[in-house]
């Protein structure tokens, strides 16, 4: 499994939208859902690689699948 770079939170939101997630609510964090899973994305830049890896795992995607949506 390859590593994820630290990325901008807006890029992460766009990638998850391509994966079928929709924004549920926004505040200091953005909460997204695909009707099965709930994912929370912090609003700071860049999102560290370790945190981004957890978000991708929570979304039920592999790193390679997520990178394809970037």
Predicted regions and their residues:
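Basic nucleic-acid-binding interfaces
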Residues: 1-70
């Amino acid at each position: 499994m390859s590593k994820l770079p630290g990325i901008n939170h807006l890029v992460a939101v766009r990638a998850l939208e391509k994966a079928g997630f929709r924004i549920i609510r926004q505040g200091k964090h953005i909460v997204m859902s695909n009707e099965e899973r709930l994912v929370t994305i912090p609003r700071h830049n860049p999102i560290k690689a370790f945190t981004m890896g957890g978000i991708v795992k929570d979304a039920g995607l592999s790193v390679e699948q997520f990178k394809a949506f970037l």
